[in-house]
Regions:
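Hydrophobic transmembrane architecture of multi-pass small-molecule transporters
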Residues: 10, 217-218, 222, 235-260
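Phenylalanine-glycine-rich, low-complexity intrinsically disordered regions
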Residues: 44-66, 80-87
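Hydrophobic alpha-helical segments of secondary membrane carriers
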Residues: 3, 31, 35-38, 109, ...
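Interfacial helix-cap and linker-helix signal at transmembrane-aqueous boundaries
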Residues: 1, 54-57, 128-129, 160-162, ...
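Helix-loop-helix hairpins in multi-pass membrane proteins, especially solute transporters
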Residues: 1-38
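Residue-level hotspots within transmembrane alpha-helices of multi-pass secondary transporters
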Residues: 48, 155-159, 245, 249
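Small-residue-rich packing faces within the transmembrane alpha-helices of Major Facilitator Superfamily
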Residues: 5-12, 77, 151, 179-180
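Transmembrane core module of solute transporters
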Residues: 87-231
Length: 260
């Protein structure tokens, strides 16, 4: 964890020294008041209640507590939608953009592929530690092909779309890679799976993740007006964040049940 400190410090210094964004007119207080605090709080409560319900479902506590948390998640989500559609002047999730087919599909794709990717990143080391009995270094090393594939395929897919002028085939291929990569992990066996098979199956989910994020962002930018690029991109990042959170919070229950 300490290795991240100098990297984050270098990133902070670089942004502080090089990034120059013209400031808009108005005081700091006026800019802070523009933030959708109500929507943010409602979304936070909904996600926290959902995570609590999943955590209680894994424990031996009363089932009523699980249902109460789920009800709280539904209520929080309902309040969030109401605030975004009826109250917020600058909503966290602009519903008029999300109501269109392309932004909605892009947001859903980003959320689902993030769920899959972060589920893999969270549980693959846990599998090698708990099931295979490897060291922490070996368990973490198995993630290297996934991360490298995500970075490389993100760049390659962007170049491919730039040369061909079409993103449909690349999006379909990215989704196929993600599905095949996740399915190949289902055939891992403690004694029967050789080491080379782990290395061979690890990159594909990362490859699909990296290329999907890049290509869908291009598709989104081309489908909205220039003035809507920022809020539309914000919606996709919201779904990506929620997908990554659910990937790390929902999948542990399935993982624990499979080990049991």
């Amino acid at each position: 964890f300490l290795l991240q400190v100098p990297l984050c410090a270098a990133h902070l210094l670089f942004v502080f020294a090089k990034v120059r964004i013209p400031s808009e007119p108005g005081s700091v207080r006026d800019k802070v008041l523009r933030i959708d605090m109500g929507g943010t709080l409602a979304l936070l409560c909904a996600v926290a209640a959902l995570v609590a319900a999943l955590a209680c479902g894994d424990a031996d506590g009363p089932r009523l507590l699980v249902y109460l948390w789920l009800a709280g998640a539904v209520i929080g989500a309902g309040v969030f939608v109401w605030l975004e559609t009826r109250v917020a002047a600058e909503p966290l999730m602009p519903t008029q953009i999300l109501a269109r087919r392309m932004p909605a599909c892009v947001s859903l794709a980003c959320g689902l592929v993030s769920l899959c990717q972060f589920g893999v990143l969270y549980h693959v080391p846990l599998y090698f530690l708990a099931v295979q009995g490897t060291s922490t270094v070996q368990a973490g090393a198995y993630l290297v092909p996934n991360v490298l594939a995500a970075s490389v395929c993100s760049l390659v897919s962007g170049r491919l779309v730039s040369r061909t002028g079409s993103y449909r085939a690349t999006v379909l291929l990215s989704g196929l890679l993600t599905v095949l990569g996740a399915l190949s992990m289902c055939f891992w066996r403690r004694q029967a799976t050789p080491a080379w098979a782990y290395w061979l199956t690890m990159p594909w989910v990362g490859a699909g993740f990296g290329s999907t994020l890049t290509v869908t962002l291009v598709a989104l930018v081309l489908s909205v007006d220039p003035m809507e690029v920022a809020p539309a991109s914000g919606v996709t990042y919201l779904f990506r964040a929620e997908g990554s959170l659910l990937g790390e919070s929902c999948t542990p229950s399935l993982f624990q049940r499979s080990l049991a």
